[in-house]
């Protein structure tokens, strides 16, 4: 039987886990309030917005994938997805080679709502953003929270972090800032950028 040597004290372990727990609770309280305010005009709750977000980046995800990457129970993912389907924001389907799983995809209306949400984002109304602003002014960039990401990777696995990173990479590539708003880059400007990149290399 494999034994691992305990090279930490119980007090140290308790202090660390409670520090993380209480800081996370305080942070979540603020995040939840701002998130709800942001999506309120679109008549969405946090789970519904998260489902739309994941569906956008997956381009077709199973309910179990939605549950996994949305950190919610499968029944929660299914029930909220159903509500979004009733509103015409999602469509449900089965794959020919996978009849067991239910897959969801954003409808045109669903993508439209998500893009309008992106456009309506106002950083001045976000407490976490404003709380991190002094650090950006001091160091020239926002905190990368690498230690937190490492902890999350160790809890939820590599797949979770790959999807997490893919979503933010998509935003970097698919969206541009226009008149102080985030808007989806149109196909023509994407082609033009690719041409310029290939010419310069």
From Swiss-Prot:
The keyword DNA-binding applies. Residues 63-86 bind DNA. SMART domains: HTH_MARR (SM00347). Residues 13-157 form the HTH marR-type domain. GO terms for molecular function: DNA binding; DNA-binding transcription factor activity. Signal peptide: none annotated. InterPro entries: HTH_MarR-typ, HTH_tscrpt_reg_Hpr, MarR/SlyA-like, Tscrpt_reg_MarR-type_CS, WH-like_DNA-bd_sf, WH_DNA-bd_sf. Coiled coil: none annotated. Keywords: DNA-binding, Repressor, Sporulation, Transcription, Transcription regulation. It holds the Pfam family MarR. GO terms for biological process: negative regulation of DNA-templated transcription; response to stress; sporulation resulting in formation of a cellular spore. Homodimer. Negative regulator of protease production and sporulation. HAMAP family: HTH_type_Hpr. This is HTH-type transcriptional regulator Hpr. It comes from Geobacillus sp. (strain WCH70).
């Amino acid at each position: 039987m494999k034994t691992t040597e305990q090279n930490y004290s119980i007090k140290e372990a308790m202090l660390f886990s409670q520090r993380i727990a209480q800081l996370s609770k305080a942070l979540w309280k603020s995040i939840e309030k701002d998130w709800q305010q942001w999506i309120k005009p679109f008549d969405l709750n946090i789970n519904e917005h998260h489902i739309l977000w994941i569906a956008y980046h997956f381009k077709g995800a199973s309910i179990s994938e939605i549950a996994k990457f949305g950190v919610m129970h499968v029944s929660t993912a299914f029930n909220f997805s159903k509500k979004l389907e009733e509103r015409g924001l999602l469509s449900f389907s089965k794959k020919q080679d996978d009849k067991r799983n239910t897959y969801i995809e954003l409808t045109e209306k669903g993508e439209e709502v998500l893009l309008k949400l992106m456009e309506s984002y106002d950083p001045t109304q976000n407490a976490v953003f404003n709380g991190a602003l002094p650090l950006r002014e001091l160091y020239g960039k926002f905190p990368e929270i690498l230690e937190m990401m490492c902890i999350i990777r160790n809890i939820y696995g590599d797949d979770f972090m790959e999807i997490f990173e893919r979503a933010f990479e998509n935003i970097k590539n698919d969206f541009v800032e226009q008149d102080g708003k985030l808007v989806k880059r149109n196909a023509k400007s994407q082609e033009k950028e690719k041409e310029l990149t290939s010419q310069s290399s």
